[in-house]
Amino acid sequence: MALSTIVSQRKQIKRKAPRGFLKRVFKRKKPQLRLEKSGDLLVHLNCLLFVHRLAEESRTNACASKCRVINKEHVLAAAKVILKKSRG
């Protein structure tokens, strides 16, 4: 592997959550919704976890179909599975 493709495990991401954007979207879509101070962070974390699960599941689908590239079909199939699991 080339040196530029190796990412250090100890390096932490310093980017912050887009709190202003999330609050603006909440107010625009649901003006009657009242959230506590860290409610937007919980929504952001939930979105990140969903995207992470979606990436893992779609990668599994791509490997199962012996494809090196994750296609649209892999992502859609993974989304169906994840949304079924999250319904409870």
Curated annotation (Swiss-Prot):
GO biological process: cell division; CENP-A containing chromatin assembly; chromosome organization; chromosome segregation; kinetochore assembly; mitotic cell cycle
Molecular function, one GO term: protein heterodimerization activity
Keyword terms of this UniProt record: Cell cycle, Cell division, Centromere, Chromosome, DNA-binding, Kinetochore, Mitosis, Nucleus
Stored CDD domains: HFD_CENP-W (cd13732)
Compartments reported by the entry: Nucleus; Chromosome, Centromere; Chromosome, Centromere, Kinetochore; Nucleus matrix
Main location as per UniProt: nucleus
Domain of life from the UniProt record: Eukaryota
GO terms for cellular component: chromosome, centromeric region; inner kinetochore; kinetochore; nuclear matrix; nucleolus; nucleoplasm; nucleus
Tissue note: Highly expressed in ovary, liver, lung and pancreas and to a lower extent in breast and gastrointestinal tract cancers; such as those of the colon, rectum and stomach. Overexpressed in high grade breast invasive tumors. Expressed in many cancer cell types.
InterPro entries (alphabetical): CENP-W, CENP-W/WIP1, Histone-fold
Function of the molecule: Component of the CENPA-NAC (nucleosome-associated) complex, a complex that plays a central role in assembly of kinetochore proteins, mitotic progression and chromosome segregation. The CENPA-NAC complex recruits the CENPA-CAD (nucleosome distal) complex and may be involved in incorporation of newly synthesized CENPA into centromeres. Part of a nucleosome-associated complex that binds specifically to histone H3-containing nucleosomes at the centromere, as opposed to nucleosomes containing CENPA.
Subunit relationships: Heterodimer with CENPT; this dimer coassembles with CENPS-CENPX heterodimers at centromeres to form the tetrameric CENP-T-W-S-X complex, which is a subcomplex of the large constitutive centromere-associated network (CCAN, also known as the interphase centromere complex or ICEN). Interacts with NPM1.
Recorded family membership: Belongs to the CENP-W/WIP1 family.
Protein known as: Centromere protein W
Organism annotation: Homo sapiens
